């Protein structure tokens, strides 16, 4: 193994188990830092070891509670920069606020993904590493290099192992996800592709799900970047089963799973939901028989190693 004495990994409180798994994959210990709260709730951070001239990686998804976790990340970066770290890479497995990435129809709303990116850059982070951004263009909101790595190799390997490619069809849950679904289908021996076209015929009429493609008697694999309340996902599963699908499974990178998500999944016709550990699961999600979690620790550890030693990251994804 290459010399990793100048590589340090720190973590906020958002996803300590993932950070520990990454350290184990890298063969390094977790950096010593106090990340807690003052009595009034303000974030308190103290780096408890020297980081001078070290290559530092801070692992902190900005999942719920988003504001607190983002603030922890910002304060950690600032503390490390002030302690003379050679470079600080913000490792953000799930980049919260990413869905607020544009002004629809020029409405009077913020572009919060840009706000979060500017705040991270203002703390003088040297680089950002993230997984499956909601939109690739968000990389342009940052003034520093961004490595947006994809969980697809991990998810594809599991699809091959669990379901094979016989009688399988990849399904995009909406028109916007067609590019992602097509890429997955290509890697599954050019599997068939179906698209769910959601539309509301007129005001006060329920949304209709039109399925473009033949799913009769097939195992349907829905692919997407995140699942929130799972309402749309569960409705899609019901529509696919109604059209004769044999089985409906979903492979989704980020398990936001807010509100009634777990209940929705338990009561749905979805056979299995496979997610990653970019966001920690709640107790209800961990005990849900339909939810299975894969780890991105090995993927992120290898990417961190390549960044630290000046190797290509893009070659991880060359076909």
From Swiss-Prot:
Gene3D superfamilies noted in UniProt: 3.40.50.2020
Keyword terms: ATP-binding, Cytoplasm, Kinase, Magnesium, Metal-binding, Nucleotide biosynthesis, Nucleotide-binding, Transferase
First-level EC class: transferase
A GO CC term attached to the entry: ribose phosphate diphosphokinase complex
Source organism, top-level taxon: Bacteria
Family: Belongs to the ribose-phosphate pyrophosphokinase family. Class I subfamily.
Protein name stated in the entry: Ribose-phosphate pyrophosphokinase
Species whose genome carries this gene: Xanthomonas axonopodis pv. citri (strain 306)
Gene expressing this chain: prs
């Amino acid at each position: 193994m290459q010399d990793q004495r100048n590589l340090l990994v720190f973590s906020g409180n958002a996803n300590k188990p993932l950070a520990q798994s990454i350290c184990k994959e890298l063969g390094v210990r977790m950096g010593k830092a106090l990340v807690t709260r003052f009595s009034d709730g303000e974030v308190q951070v103290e780096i408890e070891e020297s980081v001078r001239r070290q290559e530092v990686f801070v692992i902190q998804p900005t999942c719920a509670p988003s504001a607190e976790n983002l603030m922890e990340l910002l304060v950690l970066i600032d503390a490390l920069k002030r302690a003379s770290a050679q470079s600080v890479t913000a490792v953000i497995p799930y980049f919260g606020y990413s869905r607020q990435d544009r002004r629809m129809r020029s409405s009077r709303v913020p572009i919060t993904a840009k706000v979060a990116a500017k705040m991270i850059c203002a703390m003088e982070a040297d680089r950002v590493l993230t997984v499956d951004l909601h939109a690739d263009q968000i990389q342009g909101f940052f003034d520093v290099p961004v490595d947006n790595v994809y969980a697809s190799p991990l998810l594809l390997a599991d699809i091959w192992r669990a379901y094979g490619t016989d009688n399988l069809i990849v399904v995009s849950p909406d028109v916007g996800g067609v590019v992602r679904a097509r890429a997955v289908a290509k890697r599954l021996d050019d599997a068939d592709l179906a698209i769910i076209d959601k539309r509301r015929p007129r005001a006060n009429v329920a949304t209709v799900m039109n399925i473009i493609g033949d799913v009769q008697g097939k195992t349907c694999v829905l692919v997407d970047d995140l699942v929130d309340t799972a309402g749309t996902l569960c409705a899609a599963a019901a529509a696919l089963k109604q059209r004769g699908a044999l089985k409906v499974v979903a492979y989704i990178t980020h398990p936001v799973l807010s509100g009634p998500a777990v209940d929705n999944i338990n009561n749905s016709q979805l056979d299995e939901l496979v997610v990653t550990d970019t966001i920690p699961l709640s107790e209800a999600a961990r005990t849900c028989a339909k939810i299975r979690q894969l780890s991105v620790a090995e993927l992120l550890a290898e990417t961190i190693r390549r960044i630290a030693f000046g190797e290509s990251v893009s070659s991880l994804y060359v076909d």
